[in-house]
């Protein structure tokens, strides 16, 4: 497990004075600023100060960003928080970052693939699986009925996929 977790991303500039559109991946979107200092993928640290709520996200300022050009240059940049600053999760909840890369086996032990991404389009989380024998990606509902076991220490997920999915 990484010592950093992606908690948001820069969606682009907001205005001409260096404000940014921030997409928070936190359960409570405004909590993203409470995990300061944040860092970029390359490890550079920054501090986020939220300035308001806007359509599809938040507006805010990052240290060192003072104009639209600097804000535009950060479009798509991911923001990371130190894992030890994040709340401890109950046993049946997981950070998406911890699921990516885990091997997924069916209840008979056959490897189905590895988790490539975790998506949520409003109706619940979906695990995107890729692997040998799959023509492309397969989306597996991340529910207790379909995914009864997640063992982070062993790097393994046991799934009971719906009939006909594989």
Curated annotation (Swiss-Prot):
Which branch of life, at top level? Bacteria
**Localization (cell):** Cytoplasm
Query: Which cellular component terms (GO) are annotated to the entry?
Result: cytoplasm; ribosome
- One Pfam assignment: PRC_RimM
Keyword Transcription regulation part of the UniProt annotation: no
Residue span(s) of domain PRC barrel: 91-165
What GO MF terms are annotated? Answer: ribosome binding
Report keywords, A-Z: Chaperone, Cytoplasm, Ribosome biogenesis, rRNA processing
Tell me which Gene Ontology terms the entry assigns under biological process: ribosomal small subunit biogenesis; rRNA processing
Q: Which family does it belong to?
A: Belongs to the RimM family.
State what this protein does. Answer: An accessory protein needed during the final step in the assembly of 30S ribosomal subunit, possibly for assembly of the head region. Essential for efficient processing of 16S rRNA. May be needed both before and after RbfA during the maturation of 16S rRNA. It has affinity for free ribosomal 30S subunits but not for 70S ribosomes.
Subunit structure, as described in the record: Binds ribosomal protein uS19.
What does the UniProt entry state concerning the protein's domains? Answer: The PRC barrel domain binds ribosomal protein uS19.
* NCBIfam families associated with the record: 16S_RimM (TIGR02273)
Please identify the protein, giving its name as recorded: Ribosome maturation factor RimM
Q: Which organism is it from?
A: Dinoroseobacter shibae (strain DSM 16493 / NCIMB 14021 / DFL 12)
High-level lineage:
Bacteria, Pseudomonadati, Pseudomonadota, Alphaproteobacteria, Rhodobacterales
